[in-house]
Amino acid sequence: LTGADLEGLDGLNFHTLCEQDSDALEATLEGVEAKFGDLLRRVKWLNMGGGHHITRAGYDTERLIRLIKGIKERYGIAVYLEPGEAIALGTGVLVSTVLDTLHNAMDLAILDVSITCHMPDCLEMPYRPDIRGAGHPRELAHTYRLGGGTCLAGDIIGDYSFPEPLATGQRLIFEDMAHYTMVKTSMFNGVKHPAFCLWDPESKTLKTIRQFTYGDFRDRMG
């Protein structure tokens, strides 16, 4: 950026972390200060991006505090952290139902949820979502390939094992599904979305926040 016209530039942003502890942030800041320290003295704020696993057990928050205070003191600027998935880590479940089971080279189960519609981040990252009470293939007695109910050939959630055979109508609970997934869903071919609900563990009540209808799909199409 040497010689660049930076008039009107109020702040700088870097986004280099993903599920990292504050030691990775410290290494990044050392590089930022070495290469862009002169710019930090000319701006009003620094956005350190996301990817900070602040809520994870063992995260070094004391180091994070020290790093933030150090930047503020050295340059007199505001410091921002993007919340990222840490604010929802380990929260939220996606409750699905087994629609049918069959056998074609291996045991299969069709669910009323779709990885392309309801769990797109699992495809894009990609990562394998955890199912409560399930294991990796052949870890438990009965292994199934789980698929969604859309016409997409690649709508395959993955292979999981269960202690007992799956049955039509059985509920399967996908864990840790609150981050990214909800904001990236699609209504591919009019597939129905699950409702958003809040569970109160003290009163043991479930409050429905939003239910989706065909009208939501129609209106998104213009």
Q: Model segments located where?
A:
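Active-site loop/helix belt of alpha/beta enzymes
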Residues: L1-N104, N189
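Charged (often Lys/Glu-rich) extended helix/loop segments that serve as interaction or gating elements
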Residues: L67, A78-G222
